[in-house]
Regions:
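Receiver (REC) domain switch/active-site residues of two-component response regulators
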Residues: 67, 201, 417
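ATP-dependent carboxylate-amine ligase
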Residues: 1-27, 37-43, 53-56, 259, ...
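Short, basic phosphate-binding NTP loop
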Residues: 2-119, 126-137, 223, 307, ...
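Non-catalytic positions within long, well-ordered alpha-helices that form the structural scaffold/packing
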Residues: 58-63, 174, 196, 231, ...
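Short, active-site-adjacent cap segments at secondary-structure transitions
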Residues: 76-78, 147-149, 189-191, 245-249, ...
Length: 505
């Protein structure tokens, strides 16, 4: 999928902002909120952010050739004097209107493709990745791993880009041939209105567990942010994991006119094969069977019974697979075709990705689990595939919710046989302090080691583990960097695990 070229050659501001303000009839080449991406002829959009204001970067934008500045006079910041050749347009309430402005600028790309927006604490990436694969050659993925048609992706910066960048990427995907797009939607994106202006006929919730409380403050605020997805423009279907407590509540208060598909992947608690509590649309597991090659799921939908085999492992991946099945059915894909496409779909990079260290060595598993719930689920999934000891290498991110650190320790101690505590993006915090907060949650009944150098920690666990053992390397997944201070240093758990596996006799 070639996404190299932009299809927008320039738009007149008077037309773009019609109905908002009277703007001059000048043409701008592109829109951007990031001063670093400004090119000559662009309009720089300067708005208040979480920790700074776009006007703080105005000088940089002008130096790079911005020909116009759009700003909101109601945000309490005055616009500095501009060079005579630069046009300024003040737009009251610009932040609330920017999604629609960007949508118009890029030719309303979400009218040219059917989008599925997926939110939730855990599982967004896997679900979107699986869904994009099921969509085939006309499908695309946009999220944490980048954007494009799996497995060939262009790197991205955020799970969900800002509203201008998002519309730009959608236009590129559509122009490259995408007609169905699976989109990860983060709680930050929903809170910051990054998906405003995007039409999302299909929506889904995976689950809601503790994460991002450094940003949202409370679980109630976190849940409220997630719920905004189902009030976005053009929502027609909501596919919700009702095995999750928040999901069950959300399913009772969807907006009028939104068709609900209930997904239940836990046979012990699932309703009988007539559907989830009488729902007209449902995907319900009646049996989940783990085996050496993955999962076998037996279930029932409003279209009849189903049987699904997948190379993915773990009960949580049964939830992910059934959620994607629900999205496919809601999007009009026939059940046999949906099952066939899911059977051949593979897990994304860094999501329970296995590296076998020869016949005499352990299996290394790289995973993105970085919340207590995700870590517990990954350990539980791997326990079913571990004849020997289960090791866990993990840490906790700096400048993020410190309250989850002892919880991560408790979960790791409960689920693993041996632990290695290490660094995981300490950022501007003291790494020793982070490790100390993690160890405070340990009781001491499981073997535990501390090795702050992450590469050495992984190598230590790989050397100490034996054939039949599994080493879960948790927290970073696909990431290829380690953040110390404000510096990103090259570091890849996947690359190291692959090298250790290749070097094993």
């Amino acid at each position: 999928m070639n996404m190299a070229a932009d299809s927008v050659e320039g738009v007149e501001l008077a037309w773009l902002l019609a109905g908002l303000v009277a703007a001059p009839r000048i043409t701008v080449r592109d829109l951007t909120q990031d001063s670093r991406s400004v090119r000559p002829g662009d309009a720089f959009v300067a708005l208040a952010g979480v920790s700074s204001h776009g006007l703080d970067y105005l000088e940089d934008a002008l130096a790079r050739g911005a020909s116009a500045v759009l700003w909101d006079p109601t945000e309490g910041r005055a616009l500095p004097p501009l060079p005579p050749a630069v046009t300024s347009v003040s737009v009251p309430g610009l932040k609330a209107e920017l999604g629609d402005v960007a949508d118009r600028f890029y030719g309303e790309p979400s009218t040219d493709a059917a989008l599925a927006g997926i939110t939730g604490t855990n599982g967004k990436t896997t679900c979107a990745w699986l869904l994009a694969q099921c969509y085939g050659v006309r499908g695309a993925y946009l999220g944490t791993l980048g954007q494009g048609r799996p497995p060939e992706l262009t790197a991205g910066t955020y799970t969900t880009p800002d509203c201008i960048a998002l519309q730009r990427v959608l236009r590129r995907l559509v122009d490259a041939g995408a007609r169905r797009i699976a989109l990860e939607v983060s709680s930050h994106a929903l809170d910051q209105q990054r998906v405003a202006g995007v039409r999302l006929p299909l929506t889904a919730l995976t689950n809601l567990t503790r994460d991002h409380l450094d940003y949202h403050g409370t679980m109630a605020a976190y849940g409220a942010a997630k719920e905004r997805l189902f009030h976005c423009r053009g929502v027609e279907h909501a596919v919700i994991n009702v095995g999750d407590g928040f999901g069950r509540e959300l399913a009772t208060r969807l907006p009028a006119g939104v068709a609900l598909t209930r997904v239940e992947a836990h046979p012990a608690t699932a309703p009988p094969a007539g559907g989830a509590r009488g729902a007209a649309r449902f995907v319900t597991a009646t049996r989940v069977i783990p085996h050496a090659a993955g999962l076998e799921i037996e279930g029932v939908t409003q279209h009849g019974t189903c049987q699904l085999r997948s190379p993915l492992v773990g009960q949580f991946n049964a939830e992910n697979l059934l959620l994607v099945l629900g999205l496919l059915l809601a999007g009009g894909v026939p059940l046999p075709e949906a099952l066939a496409s899911l059977t051949s779909a593979t897990a994304p990079p860094g999501r329970l990705e296995r590296f076998v260290c020869g016949r005499a060595g352990p299996t290394l598993v790289v995973d993105y689990a970085h919340t207590p719930d995700a870590l517990a689920k990954s350990l539980a999934a791997l326990r079913l595939h571990t004849p020997g000891r289960l090791w866990c290498v993990f840490g906790c991110g700096g400048d993020r919710d410190p309250g989850k650190r002892p919880l991560m320790a408790a979960v790791a101690e409960a689920g693993a046989d041996a632990l290695v505590l290490t660094d995981d993006n300490p950022r501007t915090e003291d790494p020793e302090r982070i490790v100390a907060m993690i160890t405070a949650g340990l009781t001491g009944h499981v073997e535990a080691h501390v090795e702050r150098d992450r590469a050495r920690a992984i190598e230590f666990a790989a050397r100490r583990a034996h054939a039949g053992d599994v080493v879960l390397i948790a927290g970073k997944g696909h990431e290829d960097y380690q953040i110390y201070g404000h510096e990103r240093r090259p570091a890849s758990d996947r690359a190291l695990a692959a090298a250790l596996a290749e070097a094993a006799p």
